[in-house]
Swiss-Prot record:
GO terms for cellular component: cytosolic large ribosomal subunit. Keywords: Ribonucleoprotein, Ribosomal protein. Transmembrane segments: none annotated. It comes from Kosmotoga olearia (strain ATCC BAA-1733 / DSM 21960 / TBF 19.5.1). This is Large ribosomal subunit protein bL27. Belongs to the bacterial ribosomal protein bL27 family. GO terms for biological process: translation. The keyword Iron-sulfur does not apply. Gene3D superfamilies: 2.40.50.100. Residues 1-21 are annotated as: Disordered. The gene is rpmA. It comes from the Bacteria. PROSITE patterns: RIBOSOMAL_L27.
Length: 83
């Protein structure tokens, strides 16, 4: 066993807390107004119809309905359509 830690080993051993990002409600999922659909960093996916965006880029439903993902002009959008 080494009596001294190897060079740099004492400076390792940290990790950041989990951020729980990603899609929270998938395609065709029924959501109520205010339900978080996606948590993200930046506009990886843009808000479509009946979807709002929080200041941390969280996308959430503005109405009750079904979630629908679509691509337009090389951009991904998520929309909520009423039943």
């Amino acid at each position: 066993m080494a009596h001294k830690r190897s060079s740099g080993a004492g400076r390792n051993g940290r990790d950041s807390n989990p951020k729980y990002l990603g899609v929270k409600r998938g395609e065709n999922a029924f959501v109520r107004a205010g339900t978080i659909i996606i948590r993200q960093r930046g506009t990886k996916i843009h808000p479509g119809q009946n979807v709002g965006m929080g200041r941390d880029f969280t996308l959430y439903a503005l109405i009750d309905g079904k979630v629908h993902f679509e691509t337009r002009n090389n951009r991904k959008y998520v929309s909520v359509y009423a039943e």
